[in-house]
Amino acid sequence: MPERNVKVGSSVGLHARPATIFTQAASKLPVKVTIAKANGGNAVDARSVLFVLGLDVRGGDEVVLAAEGDGADAALDELEALLQRDLDKE
């Protein structure tokens, strides 16, 4: 299963708006994606806004994205690019 470490670009982290944008993007992908804090936290379903909010990811934190299935690398590319942006300013 491919993984990516990504530094979160949103200045205040994955609060309601950025988490919603992220989970909506993950929900549209044809593969299963998980997200976890890079410090060894539990991986959660990237399609669930409640699970993503529960990670308490702050701006500048590093997360680990993992995807399973055909197209996993492309899915990770898309979500990595999304998380690196400051979604609070969009």
Predicted segments with their positions:
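C-terminal structural segments of small proteins and small subunits
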Residues: 54-90
